[in-house]
Regions:
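Short, solvent-exposed loop/edge segments of extracellular or virion-exposed proteins
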Residues: 32-48, 113-115
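N-terminal capping/linker segments that flank leucine-rich repeat
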Residues: 29, 101-214, 218-219, 229-234, ...
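Core hydrophobic positions of leucine-rich repeats
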Residues: 176-187, 210-220, 226-230, 238-249, ...
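Acidic, Ser/Thr
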Residues: 36, 57-63, 123-125
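Conserved "repeat-terminator" motif of extracellular CCP/Sushi domains
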Residues: 6-31, 82-106, 216, 244, ...
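Extracellular modular ligand-binding repeats in secreted and cell-surface proteins
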Residues: 13-16, 42-68, 91-94
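Surface-exposed interfaces of beta-sheet-rich extracellular modules
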Residues: 1-8, 53-84
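A short, solvent-exposed beta-strand micro-motif common in secreted/extracellular proteins
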Residues: 22, 54-62, 166-172
């Protein structure tokens, strides 16, 4: 409350009785509440309120948007929690203005190849609802991406009127699932996969995901991943086994696709039988818990080299069976496995590859190795073999049959023990 003047008055009584009446009024100020693009507010507009009394305010994002905080644009009003869409504002001395801000919701952007009048399944995402821009001028709002009857396996579909390649944008909140492999039928077999060609962007929160095993396996349509697709779940995923296994047209992946996957233990068959043109240097950066790399890059004819330091952060790695089998690589980087001091299993690691140059220190510090059978089997162009039979360097090796089978062009082939050939 406030008074119009001083609260202390001097009144000469002059020997007479006097009666005084004091008047008071509420101290009010105006609060203007505005909404930025992408949402609405309550209350809205300009209203008068008593000072020092909290006023409830609420911001509601439109479909495809999310709340991005309150800002004071005029006056001395204070907001209890500027980051919450439902909070209180308190006026003090001045008329004030506040604004609710919104931002475009998280997005998943990818391209699809479509045939005219053919149903095209969308990728599986949970939670929602979502806004889907199909790239052909049609936009669907409040899309529920759960297939009827399959509460665990969502899905959505679209029909294009003409043949072509379309860029699809899905906007929405956090997801409870993430897969382009389609929905599951009653026999738990995946059906109706999304024919995604390139995945361009993902900022949808999939932090709930802990397994990416088989997530894209067998997707013949997939050609490239050009974004940090798993950024929001990288600290939670424990396995990536078979993730892109037999994606026979996948030729390009984001550099650092698995960077920071510090809980993931298994990358076996991750890129087996794909069309990768190269292995990005940061693919396994920060993968400190990785244990298995069995057949990770096997049977990829386009790979011609292995980046130096590829496994430098994989200090707990143990298994490298057939990791680079059937590759057209000509050389192996120095000290490729030197940081993998716990590694024990190198069966068929470079089997039937075209490698010619292998440095003697490729297995440096790997004193725990137990199995090197078929490690260089049928590497018929190799010019020199790492001396794994040196027991002072590798005292734990117990299995070594066919280690150097058909490697008779190696300059030190004659020094290889007969049981290793």
């Amino acid at each position: 409350y406030a008074q119009s003047g001083s609260s202390t008055f001097t009144v000469p009584l002059g020997g007479q009785d006097h009666k005084f009446r004091c008047g008071f009024k509420e101290k009010k100020r105006d609060l203007t509440v505005n909404a930025g693009t992408g949402g609405s507010v309550s209350p809205s507009g300009t209203n008068s309120y008593r000072v020092e009394k909290p006023i409830s305010i609420t911001a509601t994002p439109d479909s495809g948007y999310e709340f991005a905080g309150w800002t004071v644009t005029q006056g001395d009003v204070t907001i209890e929690n500027p980051g919450s869409p439902a909070t209180t504002a308190t006026l003090h001395n001045d008329n004030s203005t506040i604004t609710a801000n919104f931002k475009s919701g998280a997005e998943l952007v990818f391209t699809v190849r479509a045939s005219a009048n053919k149903i095209v399944p969308m990728p599986t995402l949970g939670s929602g609802p979502y806004t889907v821009d199909y790239g052909d001028g049609k936009v669907a709002h409040e899309v529920n991406l759960r297939a009827p009857g399959y509460t665990q396996y969502p899905g959505s579909y679209h029909t294009y009127s003409a043949d072509g390649e379309y860029t699809v944008t899905i906007k929405g909140p956090a997801a409870t699932a993430f897969s382009f492999r389609g929905t599951r039928n009653s026999d738990l077999q995946y059906i109706n996969p999304c024919p995604a060609k390139s995945i361009l962007k993902n900022t949808i929160d999939i932090s709930c995901v802990t397994s990416l095993e088989d997530a894209f396996s067998g997707m013949k349509s997939l050609e490239s991943i050009e974004c940090d697709l798993f950024e929001s779940c990288k600290g939670r995923v424990t396995t990536c086994a078979n993730i892109f296994d037999q994606c026979t047209n996948l030729h390009t992946i984001y550099n650092g696709l698995f960077e920071g996957f510090d809980k993931c233990t298994d990358f076996s068959l991750a890129f087996h039988y794909t069309a990768l043109n190269s292995i990005p240097a940061n693919t396994f950066r920060g993968c400190t818990s990785a244990v298995k790399f069995n057949s990770t890059f096997s049977a990829i004819p386009n790979i011609l080299s292995i980046p130096a330091g590829l496994f430098d952060d994989c200090v707990n790695a143990k298994e490298f069976a057939f990791t680079f089998e059937l590759l057209n690589i000509s050389s192996v980087p120095e000290r490729l496995f030197a940081k993998c001091v716990k590694a024990t299993f190198f069966r068929g690691t470079f089997r039937q590859s075209h490698v010619t140059t292998v440095p003697g220190n490729v297995f440096e510090n790997c004193r725990a190795i137990e199995n090197v059978s078929s490690c260089f089997e049928n590497c018929s162009w190799i010019t020199s073999l790492p001396e794994m039979w040196n027991t002072s360097l590798y005292p734990q090796i117990k299995t070594y049959n066919a280690y150097a089978k058909n490697c008779n062009k190696a300059s030190n082939y004659s020094a290889v023990p007969a049981a290793w050939k």
